[in-house]
Each structure stands twice: as C-alpha cells, then as structure tokens.
Amino acid sequence: MAPGVARGPTPYWRLRLGGAALLLLLIPVAAAQEPPGAACSQNTNKTCEECLKNVSCLWCNTNKACLDYPVTSVLPPASLCKLSSARWGVCWVNFEALIITMSVVGGTLLLGIAICCCCCCRRKRSRKPDRSEEKAMREREERRIRQEERRAEMKTRHDEIRKKYGLFKEENPYARFENN
C-alpha cells in the first residue's frame, strides 16, 4: 500500500479471527496452571515441586506438608511452619534465606540508587553554576561596566570644567621652576 493512503476500517471477520487466535493461544497457558481453588492439601506427602506448581501453596519441609499460603500475612506464622523449613516459589530456597537475600538485594539497590543520585547531583552542581548564580554574575558584570562608564563620563566632565577655569593639570606637575 502506498504511503499516505488512508486505510478503511478493519473488516469484522478480521477482528473475530484475531480474537479466536488469541483465545487459542491462552487456553493451553491457562490449562497448564492449577486453579488457585485447588486444595494444596492434596499434595501433602508428595514432592515439593508438585506442591509448588500451584502458586498459592506453601511447602513445609519438616512434615512434608503442602499448605495454603496465608495471604492475610506477608510471612507464614511459625505455628504453621518454621521459616527455615518453609518453601514458596522454588524448592531450593527456604524463607529465611529468601528474606535475607531479598533484604540484601533491596538494600544494595537502594544504596546504589542513592549513590547514583548523589553523584549525578554533585556532578551537575560542579559542572556549571545554576541559573541564580549565572544571573547574579551577569548583573554584577553589568553593574561594573555601568560604573566604569560613569567614571569615564565624570572624568571627562571634570576635565572640561578644569579647562574652562584654567585649572587643568599639567602633564608633569613636578617640573623644575626656572627663573629667566
């Protein structure tokens, strides 16, 4: 199609075909996951991997129990399962290690961001003066130039007055006085 040529509205059958293709792509993805309503207790005394296929389940290593994750609290309570033996998401990381790792990574990221912000601000400040400093320097320079112009005008006016009244200073006021 040539550039600049307007296209008409999309035919209705194309919209239906696109919607059907999207639906066909999403069905296998939805079928692979266990529904969140499936009881986690069905996977008790099985493997950790089978339990954690459902994202709403928590695996307790001490008693090989698959439990519903307590969504009301961020961390599972100790009465449910100790943090050192609780697994969620992946089987090879317990909750204690996960919490410590996430804290260290989060703290490192925050510290890195803070350091980057400080360095950028310092570099920006040292690189060029800000607008108020530039304005103050410009005004100071303008005042100095006006003052020099006024001094030059005053000097010429004073010289004219001295010439008028014969008080003009000589080139060398300390010339030797000669009597002839």
Curated annotation (Swiss-Prot):
TM segment ranges: 97-117
Leader sequence residues: 1-32
Biological process terms in GO annotation: negative regulation of DNA damage response, signal transduction by p53 class mediator; negative regulation of intrinsic apoptotic signaling pathway by p53 class mediator; positive regulation of protein ubiquitination; protein import into nucleus
Glycosylated residue positions: 45, 54
Tissue: Ubiquitous.
GO cellular component, one term: extracellular exosome
Function: May facilitate PTTG1 nuclear translocation.
Quaternary assembly: Interacts with PTTG1.
Modified residues (Phosphotyrosine): 174
Subcellular location field: Membrane; Cytoplasm; Nucleus
Coiled coil: 130-165
Disulfide bridges in this chain: none
Predominant place of localization: membrane
Chain spans, region Disordered: 131-157
Extracellular side: 33-96
Positions on the Cytoplasmic side per record topology: 118-180
InterPro entries to which the protein is assigned, alphabetical: PSI, PTTG1IP
Membrane topology per record: Single-pass type I membrane protein
GO MF: p53 binding
Annotated PSI domain residues: 39-92
Protein name: Pituitary tumor-transforming gene 1 protein-interacting protein
Protein keywords: Coiled coil, Cytoplasm, Glycoprotein, Membrane, Nucleus, Phosphoprotein, Signal, Transmembrane, Transmembrane helix
